[in-house]
Amino acid sequence: MSNIKEAEEQTGISRANIRYYEKMGLLQPKRNEKNGYREYRPEDIKRILQIKILRKLDVPIDEIRDTIDHPEMFGNVIQKQKERLERQRAELTDVIDFCMEIKVENFEDFDPQYYLKKMDEKEKKKVQQEGSCDS
């Protein structure tokens, strides 16, 4: 059994985050009957480390809770997160590409109408391409 300080040291997760995970229903350590302190068993430490990995993968807390409540959903949760990250990557690639199209050096020369029009055109083209892929 570990106290919260030891759990923090073993996992690299702050006490505040460990308490937050408890509050969100992701973790339920036993309480010492004599002093009321939390006592973390090896399976609690493992759970904290599992949560740590899923949070590093940017999996939302509610989906982590679903995975804990229904372990058989884990594969679906990971697949859903992968798809979400792939969409974000595509969006970021579009934004980076658009940044490279901006040719002005001076903010005063930056024409918002021109670039908003280009953005709208790109968005329409992307929607059309996605529509033709769905057909």
Report residues per predicted region.
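Basic helix-turn-helix/winged-helix DNA-binding cores
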Residues: 1-62
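Hydrophobic protein-protein interaction segments
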Residues: 128-135
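Short, charged amphipathic alpha-helical surface segments
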Residues: 52, 64-125
